[in-house]
């Protein structure tokens, strides 16, 4: 059976370390770090994600600023809220929970966030810094993947690595981070011809396709490392539908590949907790810069 890349355990260890650093600073009279999460509308999945982030903030000792706006809020109303948070001296990180309701331009709103408070690493300036391998907030999911690989002592340098998916949230920044770690990276997507021809060569395969159980045994190389970024709520039994209940799954058919690959992330409990952990790391890193602190977080940053 493949080694489990346990993101839940590692995320817990990161939270404890952040909590320790924060507690030491609070004893010296420094204000706590603050993270503001803007949620627009009542998307059920977004509610769960925001709740998880708020709980993680409490565990780490980060002050959470919740901001819930109505689904029919205008671009200007959301923009004004971001501008207020930009000037709030108690807020070190700002996250705009995606997806937004139809009709709102997420890209334009992300540009309104102060790049120094960009907790999700999605501001154009910070994506440019990633491209140039300069210091700045990093996209949380790929940063979490890099931390998970490092913690499990998985060698990246020189490895044939394939990333499935080219989104600005995961695929593109993931490829850049792997390249910076000296992997040989191929980025594939929905228009790629002969997907299996690429994935079968991957010593490290990162799957961020957004399609439930897309990848199976026929796609993977023996003894490879598989990182499953996807998480989906699907019927336990397609024939029974709602009556049969639901289950969570990823983009990979794990039961098929578990005895064939060397390591794999579980779903849930793999990449998801690491995404939240890196959100906290970005926030605390911004906090130390705003408060002119010297924390030893370098090994947590990709």
UniProtKB/Swiss-Prot annotation:
SUPFAM superfamilies: Aminoacid dehydrogenase-like, N-terminal domain, NAD(P)-binding Rossmann-fold domains. Disulfide bonds: none annotated. It catalyses: (6R)-5,10-methylene-5,6,7,8-tetrahydrofolate + NADP(+) = (6R)-5,10-methenyltetrahydrofolate + NADPH; (6R)-5,10-methenyltetrahydrofolate + H2O = (6R)-10-formyltetrahydrofolate + H(+). The keyword Repeat does not apply. GO terms for cellular component: cytosol. Coiled coil: none annotated. Pathway: One-carbon metabolism; tetrahydrofolate interconversion. NADP(+) binds at residues 165-167, 190, 231. One of its GO terms (biological process) is L-histidine biosynthetic process. Its EC number is 1.5.1.5, 3.5.4.9. CDD domains: NAD_bind_m-THF_DH_Cyclohyd. Pfam families: THF_DHG_CYH, THF_DHG_CYH_C. GO terms for molecular function: methenyltetrahydrofolate cyclohydrolase activity; methylenetetrahydrofolate dehydrogenase (NADP+) activity. Keywords: Amino-acid biosynthesis, Histidine biosynthesis, Hydrolase, Methionine biosynthesis, Multifunctional enzyme, NADP, One-carbon metabolism, Oxidoreductase, Purine biosynthesis. Belongs to the tetrahydrofolate dehydrogenase/cyclohydrolase family. Catalyzes the oxidation of 5,10-methylenetetrahydrofolate to 5,10-methenyltetrahydrofolate and then the hydrolysis of 5,10-methenyltetrahydrofolate to 10-formyltetrahydrofolate. Homodimer. This is Bifunctional protein FolD. It comes from Prochlorococcus marinus (strain MIT 9211). The lineage of its organism: Bacteria, Bacillati, Cyanobacteriota, Cyanophyceae, Synechococcales. The gene is folD.
């Amino acid at each position: 059976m493949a080694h489990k890349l346990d993101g839940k355990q590692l995320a817990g260890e990161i939270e404890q370390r952040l909590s320790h650093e924060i507690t030491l600073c609070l004893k010296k009279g420094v204000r706590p770090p603050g993270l503001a999460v803007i949620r627009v509308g009542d998307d059920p999945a977004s509610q769960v994600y925001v709740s998880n982030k708020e709980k993680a903030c409490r565990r780490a000792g980060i002050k959470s600023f919740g901001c819930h706006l109505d689904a029919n809020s205008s671009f200007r109303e959301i923009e004004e809220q971001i501008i207020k948070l930009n000037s709030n001296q108690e807020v070190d990180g700002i996250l705009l929970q995606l997806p937004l309701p139809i009709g709102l331009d997420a890209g334009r709103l992300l540009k309104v966030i102060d790049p120094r408070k960009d907790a999700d690493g999605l501001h154009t300036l910070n994506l440019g810094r990633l491209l140039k391998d300069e210091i700045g907030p990093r996209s949380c999911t790929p940063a979490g993947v890099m931390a998970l690989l490092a913690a499990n002592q998985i060698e990246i340098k020189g490895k044939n690595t394939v990333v499935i998916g080219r989104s600005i949230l995961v695929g593109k920044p993931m490829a850049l981070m792997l390249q910076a770690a000296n992997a040989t990276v191929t980025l594939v997507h929905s228009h790629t011809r002969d997907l299996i021809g690429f994935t079968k060569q991957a010593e490290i395969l990162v799957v961020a396709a957004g399609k439930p159980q897309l990848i199976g045994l026929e796609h993977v190389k023996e003894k490879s490392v598989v990182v499953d970024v996807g998480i989906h709520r699907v019927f336990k039994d397609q024939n029974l539908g709602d009556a049969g209940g639901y289950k969570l799954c990823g983009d990979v058919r794990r039961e098929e590949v578990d005895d064939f690959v060397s390591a794999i992330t579980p779903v849930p409990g793999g990449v998801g907790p690491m995404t939240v952990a890196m959100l906290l790391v970005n926030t605390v890193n911004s906090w130390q810069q705003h408060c002119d602190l010297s924390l030893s977080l370098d090994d947590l940053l990709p």
